[in-house]
Amino acid sequence: MSAPRHILVAVAWPYASGSRHLGHLAGAYLPADIFARYHRTVGNRVLMVSGSDVHGTPITVRADEEGVSPQEIVDRYHAEFVSNWDKVGIQWELYTSTGTDNHHAVTQDMFRHLAENGYIDTKTSEQLYDPQAQRFLPDRYVEGTCPHCGYESARGDQCDNCGRQLDPTDLISPKSRLTGATPELKGTEHYYLLLSKFQDRLLEWLRGRQGWRKHVLNMAIGFTEEGLQDRAITRDLEWGVDIPEPYDTIGEGKRIYVWFDAVIGYLSAAKEWAENTGNPEAWRDWWENPEAESYYFIGKDNIVFHAVIWPCQLLGYGGLNLPTDIPANQYVTFKGDKASASRGIGRSIGWYADRLEPDALRYALT
């Protein structure tokens, strides 16, 4: 009999900024749970992890809109997510959040390693600034027209319509979500992940993937072949993971970018799980063991972050396993529109979970 395989099941981290819709369950969480259950049944060692993403502008924008603290928003929706997973029978080894001390420490450790290895540097760039609110407008604090597909409600970090990654300065006719003002350009210093240094290694790795879904591989290779651009990994925000010493000298009010820290959550969750089991080094069996396998269950809009940026972070850190597969699903539609939590399209997981037995709901979605 062959030895049990080590299977890491890494599942997308939902923003704790609002209820998640049925597309999230059908596209990421239920497939991951079925996959993990199978591997447990046949005797493999499964580590299925995820958690609530508690940083970034989705949370701070919601808090600003409601006039409450970001922590109040996080506490509300993290509790809702945990309840929903229980209702629909999702079985985790660990469901945590990016708000833990452990996650902050692991994120800062990766930041330091990448900086020490020459993959992070500072740059000054012009970013959108709201003259009325007198503050910079990172990510979802600005909306405008997508330069790629013409969608008129694209956000400053990504277009919901075509899925392309964006910078706020890419938007056509941008408007501040704080005041409705037309932003100005103003210089600000930030840390950048030097993705351009990974161009050849990443492309070689991607071209060697076999068995991946065509739309995942085509998107990742296409994005990389266009030429990887260095990407800012800090933001002008008060909410998020602190920039670690000795790199915290570029100015007040800056934090690590949410997507740099969110994908690190798969690693920090594994370390937290290992600590909880009383064997703090157990995480290495899934992350440093060359025979271990890792599967990332995500939605289409997260492909670039998981198939391009996260592998670059892992390559730059060194010694950690790259993804075995990234079985990302396409968008779920609701009455003809793409289901979207940020745009309020589609019913929430909780709405269905409160009305249907879990087995009936799971059967209908598979």
Predicted features and spans:
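Structured secondary-structure scaffolds
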Residues: 2-50, 102-106, 172-366
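N-terminal, positively charged nucleic-acid-binding surface of large information/translation enzymes
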Residues: 2-205
